[in-house]
Structures are given as C-alpha cells and as structure tokens.
C-alpha cells in the first residue's frame, strides 16, 4: 500500500480513529429548518463513512437559540434534535467511522433574520460591508454563552458522538474574542492575551466537565486571519499551545476570516495544501494531534505531510464532496478512479450562501446518496451526441443503469468547451476532472466514437431507443458590423492553438470567458486590453476566483475599457459607444479576439424527435450556462432513463 502513514490509526483523547482521513465540517443545507438532521443528512454522512473516512465531522451546529447563521443549520440548543443526530452517528459508526460534531455560534457572521434575534460579538464591529452590526456581549452574557457550549456538547454525547469540535475560527463568535482586531473589550475578556483567551478556556473547561472526559474535545482555529491587525501564524501557534494547556485533545487548523474567504475555500488557481507551512509552525507548538485542511485533493501530499510529522490528520473538505470514496480508492490503489474537486465553487459555496442544498459539478450524486443508481427496468440502446462534460456524465450514468450507450464526438478530443477552460493560468485541474469523466465512461463500458459527426441519417440507421443531445455551444457572434471579418480570432481557436495572436491584443468581451482569455495572453507577455459592455470586468466570476483573476490583470498590466458597447469591428480594433452616446475607436492592435461568450448549438431542432421520440436535450445544447448546470441536467435525464 502506497499510503502507509495515512492508514495508521491515531488516538485523540479517548477516541481512536482508524486512519488519518477526515471529513471536516462543511455547511450543506441538508438539515431540516427546525434544526434536526434530515434523512438526506444521514445518507450524506453515511456515504463518506462508507468511503473510508476515519473521522466524520458534522457541520457547524448551533449551540445557542438565536444564533443560527442560516435557515438549514443543525441545532443542539435543546433536546428535540438529539434523536436525529443519533441517526447520523449510528449510520457512520456502522461503517467504521468516528463522529465529531462542530459546535458553533455564528456571531457577527450570522444575521438577525435567520437567527430571530440580534447577532452578537466580542465588540460591536460588523464583519463586512452590508452585514448586521452585532451587539456587544455583556460580561454576564459571556458566562451564559459558556454554559450553552457545555449543554450542547452533552447533547451531542447523548447522541453518541465520539468528539466535539469547538469552532474558534473564521470570524465567528469565539474568533472575535481571540483577535485584537475584533476584541476591544475592557473587561476580563479583553486586552491581554490571557484575557482574550479566557472565553475559549472557559468553554473547553465547561465542555469537558459536562462530557466527563468520555469524548474527545477539539477546536478549529485559524492559522492566520489574513487581514491587517488580525491574528498571524505566530499568534495562532501561541493560541494552540495555550489551548493544549486547557486540556484540548486536538487542534484543527483552517485559515482566514470571511472577508478573505479566498483563503477559506480556495479557488482552482490555489495549490493543494496551500496552508501547509503555516500548519507546520502550529504543529511545532503543540504535542496534541493537529488536523490540516486547505484544498487537499489527492493522497500523495497528504501522505507526505503525515509521514514527515508536519501534521497528524488531513481533512479533505470539498474533495470529500467530489469523491466520498477517496480513502477506499487510495487504500486499494485505484488512483485513476478518484474524482477530483476542481475548486470551482459553483455548487458548494454558492449554494451554501444562498441557503440551498449544495451540489457538485464533478459529483452529481451529491445530495442524492440515498437514491444511488437504480437499475433500468428495461435495457435501452442509448445514443449520446457530444463528448463534453454533459455528454460524458449522462453516458456513464446511463451505462451503469444497464443501458447500452454509445457516445459520439465530432472532434478528436473529449471535454467540449471545458477542455479549453483548463488553458488559462491556474486552471489546469479542470483537465483532471475531464479525465475522471472519461475513466468513468470507459470503466462503465460506454462505447465512444471519436471524429463522428451525427446526422439524422445516422440516427435513422442506428435506431436508438433514446437520444441525449449534448452538442454543447459555440462562440457567440452578435449581429455587429465587421464581426465576420476572417482576421477576427475566436477565443476558442486561440486557446486551442488553432490561431495565434500578435503582440498587441484587444479582447472583446470582459466576462469570465474574455477575462480568462486575457489572462492567458497576459501570462505569455502579450500587451492586452479588454473591452466590456458592463461597468466592470469579470462581473460574472465567482468572488473567490475573481480575486485571483484581478490579481492577474494587475500583474500582467492588462488594460480595461468598460461601459463600452462595441458597434463595429476592424481588423485592428473596434468602434464603440459609451453611455453618453458618444462614439470612440480603439485601434492599432495586432489581433482582435472575440470572447463574448457562447450560444447553444443544437443542429437537430425538433426533427430528431420525429425519428426518436424519447430524445432529451441537455447542457449548453439547451442554453449556454455553467458546467454545473450541464452535469446536473445530465444526471437528471440519465438517472430516469
């Protein structure tokens, strides 16, 4: 076995964990609105225990009434939810995993509407622009809050958990007491290091008293707040050492407060294990086990971290969403079967914030664990048209249901437009995702025919029972004078290496597609300008991705023309109109790149249904959207065939 260190058992207080693979606490919005765990919650956690994770951590669970950070947060502030937690614990125990539950008061990161009460913090400082201003907790109230943690821990123990994890990170309630940036108190809970640690110490002591040493007590802290005046790694090392002295059994090291959440749930451009050096410094400060987290996606680096003593356990957060069976595959050395998280943030973080159940671009079964893949009542001959992610996803699911599936791809490469999305700086992990879909198709037994354009005549000849049209999208070409000039380079042709750009380049379109194309060119030392209709570039880019994308713009000195409606294309530039109705020209470029997005491509229309009534159109073939929408529709269609 290649990963000996990762499969060694470890003791954490009174708890023995069978290996070093951890599912960290992650909000999923599967819980019921009354704070109880749903059947969906049970299935979600069971699947990750079944997949070999040694320690499963139930998501941030509310310990005080009036402190909910979202409508579907699990709660342990009264006895009514204990039984539902027991169902999760029993399900995980049956699969050999240990279970911890994270205890949280959202503090200033909550909101009064969800909480049903004013939010609270060490000091009345809002966490971000537009957020509620928290009420400063009185000295007497601090002591009452301490009791709430102890009672919640006792309820968790009654539900059968093996451990609790006290949330002290990310700008939530306890975190606001630790940092001098957010703690301006003048009582015994503010000022000196000892005073700022007092709340945490009292919580640990209360939790240990209420649980009588029968379960392990952990805490999650930041390695660094990543904001001026906040905690840095040296502060956090001292905090970790202090918490060990309070009787803590293990430290879980995360990173950053929410206003720098590009460090909390790092996007695609961030390397796996990007906080490793900070965790290592904290590990040197303590003798208790240390859990590291931060975009770990493969077991190789995790093995190195544990083997070299830089940490003791590794938490695979979003990776456990993408592939709940990752540890089992690592143990069996089925490394190519692993499904990689590409840190797109489309289905997990975006839905978590919106209060919707999370989903996953690379794992369409997330949230549907109880359903699995039901065998088809009758095997069908299924034709899938298009080898992008929608087609690949639909093909392997349909094949695993027992259908006879043939996938047709018109080009010599699979992956569709997602293959090109891997070309801009820092996006290479997308290739890994496409490869994983190909492997799933191959191992399921899907027949793949490359360089095969599908026509209505071919469909008539093959006589399929069902057809899934996943023909994708093509470059959006608006009715603008000169746009059809052969000198204009389509962004997809540029990324695919079919056409080359000159030194000075104008990229027309400043959405995600255009901005990433501009960064691709900037990295190669082109002189790049982006022109965009909206008032800002990258307006459609997820925040955490945009932070890094705009850093590329700064590093590569990419220029911007915004609020500009392109009216005419020239070989060397464009004419555009601004909001005041004035016309301007931007010319003198060696190349003009068209990157205004994509439009759906479905060459069959309704004619195909006259041949095969059981026809479905999915993904960009319906309307150009996110890859998440494509795989979601692929799952919905293929699972019902």
Q: Language-model features: where?
A:
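Glycine/Thr-rich phosphate-binding loops of Rossmann-like dinucleotide-binding domains
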Residues: 32, 66, 174, 227, ...
């Amino acid at each position: 076995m290649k990963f000996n260190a990762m499969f060694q058992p470890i003791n954490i207080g009174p708890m023995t964990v069978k290996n070093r693979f951890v599912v960290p606490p992650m909000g999923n919005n599967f819980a019921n609105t009354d704070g109880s765990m749903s059947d969906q919650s049970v299935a979600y956690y069971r699947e990750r225990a079944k997949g070999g994770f040694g320690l499963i951590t139930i998501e941030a669970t509310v310990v005080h009434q009036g402190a909910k950070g979202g409508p579907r947060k699990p709660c342990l502030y009264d006895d009514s939810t204990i039984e539902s937690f027991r169902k999760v614990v029993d399900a995980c125990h049956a699969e050999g995993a240990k279970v911890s539950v994270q205890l949280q008061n959202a503090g200033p990161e909550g909101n009064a509407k969800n909480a049903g009460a004013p939010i609270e913090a060490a000091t009345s400082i809002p966490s971000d622009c537009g957020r509620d201003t928290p009420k400063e907790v009185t000295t007497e109230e601090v002591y009452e809050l301490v009791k709430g943690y102890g009672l919640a821990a006792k309820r968790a123990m009654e539900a059968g958990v093996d451990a609790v994890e006290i949330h002290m990170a990310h700008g939530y309630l306890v975190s606001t007491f630790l940092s001098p940036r957010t703690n301006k108190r003048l009582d015994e809970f503010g000022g000196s290091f000892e005073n700022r640690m007092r709340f945490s110490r009292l919580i640990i002591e209360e939790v240990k008293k209420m649980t009588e040493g029968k379960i392990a007590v952990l805490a999650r802290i930041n390695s660094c707040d990543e904001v001026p005046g906040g905690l840095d790694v040296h502060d956090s090392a001292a905090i970790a050492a202090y918490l060990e002295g309070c009787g803590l059994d293990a430290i879980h090291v995360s990173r950053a407060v929410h206003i720098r959440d590009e460090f909390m749930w790092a996007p695609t451009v961030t390397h796996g294990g990007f906080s490793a050096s900070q965790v290592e410094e904290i590990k040197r400060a303590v003798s208790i086990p240390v859990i590291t987290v931060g975009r770990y996606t493969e077991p190789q680096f995790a093995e190195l971290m544990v083997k070299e003593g830089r940490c003791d356990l590794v938490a695979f957060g979003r990776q456990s969403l993408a592939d709940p069976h990752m540890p089992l595959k690592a143990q069996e050395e089925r490394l190519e079967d692993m499904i990689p998280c590409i840190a797109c943030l489309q289905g997990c973080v975006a839905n978590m914030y919106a209060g919707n159940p999370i989903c996953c671009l690379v794992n369409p079964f997330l949230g549907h664990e109880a359903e699995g893949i039901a065998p088809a009542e009758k095997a069908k001959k299924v034709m899938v048209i298009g080898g992008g992610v929608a087609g690949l996803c639909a093909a392997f699911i349909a094949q695993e249901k027992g259908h006879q599936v043939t996938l047709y791809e018109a080009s010599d490469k699979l992956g569709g437009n997602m293959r090109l999305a891997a070309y801009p700086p820092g996006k290479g992990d997308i290739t890994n995702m496409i490869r994983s879909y190909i492997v799933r198709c191959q191992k399921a037994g899907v027949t793949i025919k490359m360089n095969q354009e599908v026509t209505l005549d071919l469909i008539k000849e093959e006589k399929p029972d069902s057809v899934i049209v996943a023909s994708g999208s093509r470059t959006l070409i608006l009715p603008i004078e000169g746009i059809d000039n052969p000198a204009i380079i389509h962004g997809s042709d540029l990324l695919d290496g079919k056409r080359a750009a000159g030194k000075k380049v104008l990229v027309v379109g400043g959405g995600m597609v255009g901005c990433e194309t501009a960064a691709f060119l900037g990295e190669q030392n082109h002189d790049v300008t982006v022109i965009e209709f909206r008032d800002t570039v990258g307006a459609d880019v997820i925040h955490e991705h945009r932070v890094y994308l705009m850093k590329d713009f700064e590093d590569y000195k990419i220029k911007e023309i915004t609020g500009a409606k392109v009216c005419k294309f020239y070989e060397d530039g464009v004419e555009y109109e601004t909001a005041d109705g004035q016309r301007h020209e931007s010319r003198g470029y060696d190349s003009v790149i068209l990157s205004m997005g994509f439009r759906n491509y479905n060459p069959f229309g309704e004619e195909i249904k006259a041949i095969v009534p059981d026809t479905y159109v999915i993904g960009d073939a319906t309307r150009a959207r996110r890859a998440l929408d494509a795989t979601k529709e692929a799952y919905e269609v293929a699972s019902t065939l």
